[in-house]
Amino acid sequence: MSSLKRFITNSTQPSSSIRQPNQKAVWLSAKSGTLLAMLLAIAGVFLCSSEVTHVQAKTGQTADAKSASAIDPDAVDAVKKMSAYLRTLKSFQITDNVTQDDVLDDGLIVQHESKVDYLTARPNRLRVEVTSDDQHRLYLYDGKNFTVWARLVNYYATVPAPPTIGELIGQADEKYNIELPLYDLYNWGTKDDDVNKIKTAVDVGPSAVEGVTCEHYAFHQEGVDWQIWIQLGEFPLPRRLVITTLTDDARPQHSDTLAWNLAPSFNDGAFAFDPPPDAKRVILEGEKADATEKGK
């Protein structure tokens, strides 16, 4: 299932009695913000909407995404421009400060924070490190092998990997049930893009994120509202995303605040894994399935 379809499906389903986010299995899960999943849908609107109604909300005006029920072409154009620019980046580093609302069964909202560090060298090197109060995970890809290390329990798994980041992301999700944070970033502008209908797109106006001047846009889709802050100037980078789930009365939010480095310094060692002392190697579920199939 594509990332956008997965997000929309999860967001529009009725809340369970526990009302907490669906987590993938055991210590290898990688739930983080699906930043680019939201943006893929917006870019798709430009292609599938033949008639567009112009609605703008500049500073000092009220931006009501729900009541407007229209699409601002400026907002769509901004995301289209951003997506094209992101596809030109060959290497980059991102620090993502994440906040996530968890809604407990009694309706109480508990907010969690995490930090995700990314280092990418296209087409075949990737390093992702996730740190929070209850987890510290490292994902490494060197073009040949994919390794996941759970630092707090000192477990790791290493499996053969395909030759590109895009293929790795698909394999990790489909075969090993591992969803890498911000994985849509690496599918941008490819055949794996999602196209979905957006009910409202609004240009809210200029705003600053961590001292960086951005343009603030708001979007509405059934079950989900989200906002994106895109850096102004020659580097149209996404700087912040806020996603609000509308199917829960508590309206829980997920936010990503991104700091970019477009000229990172690194060597091949950044993507290699040297098991620490006493580290225990474990077998992924996908590996077990392969072994069973070969044994038949």
Q: Model features per residue range: what roles?
A:
Residues E113-D117, L138, Y156-T158, Q227, ...:
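Well-ordered beta-strand positions in beta-sheet-rich domains
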